[in-house]
Structures are given as structure tokens and as C-alpha cells.
């Protein structure tokens, strides 16, 4: 596995970090891009990666009333679509784990599913988030 910056966790050539900051989806994505070259909100490409991210979030989230939800790098770009065609890092969606398909536009992981299912929330709400580089 690749060497990660201090405080980042390594998994299959990528580095991940949960940030206990409340940000809107767009601000969280911008924050991730500022952490390192190629940084973005986390994209989840397999069940194995989903399980890794779920464990990382569970272990690193600081408990507050806002920690029931954590942004991932997926946003609905068009009300007519159920999902956008790509993650915020530009990679295509080849693994999916939706819990419901409403058009609240931005997706994240929900505590009551042990951070394993993708749930739609309003992009403008501030929540914790996970970055990947």
C-alpha cells in the first residue's frame, strides 16, 4: 500500500481521512481538493472499499448530533437522473449501494446503516465528510 500523509489511512493504493468538520457538499469537495493533488470526496468503487470506508468512518467520527451522516463524492447532476454519471474525482460509477432514490442531489453514508448505504441529502446541509487521495 502507498505511503500516506500522517493521519491518513491507506487502502489499495489510495489514502483516506475522515474530517470532523461540518461542511456543505461543495465546500467539503473543495476542502478535499485542497488537501493534496488529486484529492476529492471519497469515491466508493467496490464492496471491499465500502467496508473499509465504513469502518474508517465508524472509528474516526467524533460523536455529535451531526454525525449521523457523512458526505461521499457523489452528486445528482440532473433532477431527471437518479444518479450522476461520475464521482467528484471523475471516475465512473461501477459499484452502487443506494438506500433510496430521492432527488435531494448529494449522497453520503448514514450512521443507522453503519455507514454502508448511500443516502440522498440536501447538498446545502453541513455534514462531516471523508476525503480520498
UniProtKB/Swiss-Prot annotation:
Protein name, entry field: Snaclec A7
PANTHER family linked: MANNOSE, PHOSPHOLIPASE, LECTIN RECEPTOR RELATED
Additional remark text: Shows greater sequence similarity to the alpha than beta subunits compared to other heterodimer snaclecs.
Keyword field: Disulfide bond, Hemostasis impairing toxin, Secreted, Toxin
Task of the protein: Interferes with one step of hemostasis (modulation of platelet aggregation, or coagulation cascade, for example).
MF (Gene Ontology): toxin activity
Residue stretches making up the C-type lectin domain: 11-132
Disulfide bonds: 4-15, 32-131, 106-123
Keyword Transferase in annotation: no
Tissue specificity note: Expressed by the venom gland.
UniProt lineage: Eukaryota, Metazoa, Chordata, Craniata, Vertebrata
Subunit structure: Heterodimer; disulfide-linked.
Family statement: Belongs to the snaclec family.
SMART domains recorded: CLECT
Endpoints of the signal sequence: none
Domain of life: Eukaryota
Pfam families documented for this protein: Lectin_C (PF00059)
Any one GO cellular component localisation term in the record: extracellular region
Location in the cell: Secreted
Amino acid at each position: 500500500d502507498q505511503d500516506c500523509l500522517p493521519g491518513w489511512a491507506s487502502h489499495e493504493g489510495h489514502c483516506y481521512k475522515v474530517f470532523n468538520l461540518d461542511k456543505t457538499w461543495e465546500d467539503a469537495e473543495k476542502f478535499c481538493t485542497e488537501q493534496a493533488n488529486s484529492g476529492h470526496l471519497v469515491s466508493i468503487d467496490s464492496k471491499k472499499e465500502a467496508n473499509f470506508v465504513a469502518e474508517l468512518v465508524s472509528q474516526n467520527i467524533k460523536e455529535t448530533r451531526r454525525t449521523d451522516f457523512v458526505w461521499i463524492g457523489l452528486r445528482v447532476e440532473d433532477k431527471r437522473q437518479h444518479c450522476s454519471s461520475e464521482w467528484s474525482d471523475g471516475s465512473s460509477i461501477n459499484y452502487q449501494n443506494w438506500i433510496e432514490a430521492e432527488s435531494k442531489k448529494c449522497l453520503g453514508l448514514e450512521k443507522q446503516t453503519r455507514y454502508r448505504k448511500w443516502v440522498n441529502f440536501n447538498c446545502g446541509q453541513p455534514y462531516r465528510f471523508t476525503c480520498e487521495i
